[in-house]
Amino acid sequence: MLYNWAAENPEKVKCIAGIYPVCNLSSYPGLNRAAPAYKMTESELEKNLHLHNPIDKLKPLAEARIPIFHIHGNVDRVVPLKLNSGIISKRYKLLGGKMQLTVPEGQGHNMWEGFFKCKELVDFVIYSSKENFNSDR
């Protein structure tokens, strides 16, 4: 939902920061579980997935030069790195967007303190939120 809102309102977004974020509805929570949030059946969501799936809605963000930072563990089985932050990183860079992906080794989808006390993420948000940051884009 975060990426969808940002893609529809890029002029209101300074940056996107995520801790093991869901970026691919097919991967998690799965179309059958995601469909009700979009007021659709699973088959309707599958047919219209390109309109709602964050990995398919990156172009407006790249065009607006919105920087992205994710921290995502390499052994996350709930929201797999490769199918979520990994795809976002690859596609966003191909669109010319700037993204930093930090991958802590041996971490999954858990409450590891390093996710929530990541100095790089905090610094990224503070820097990106500065009023004059828009001129840097």
Give residue spans per PLM region.
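Core-facing hydrophobic residues within beta-strands of well-ordered domains
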Residues: V13-K14, R65, M99
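Alpha/beta-hydrolase
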Residues: C23-R33, I66-P67, N74, V78-V79, ...
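Surface-exposed acidic, glycine-flexible loop patches that form ligand/cofactor-binding
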Residues: K57-E63, E131-N134
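Short glycine-enriched nucleophile-adjacent loop
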Residues: M1-P10
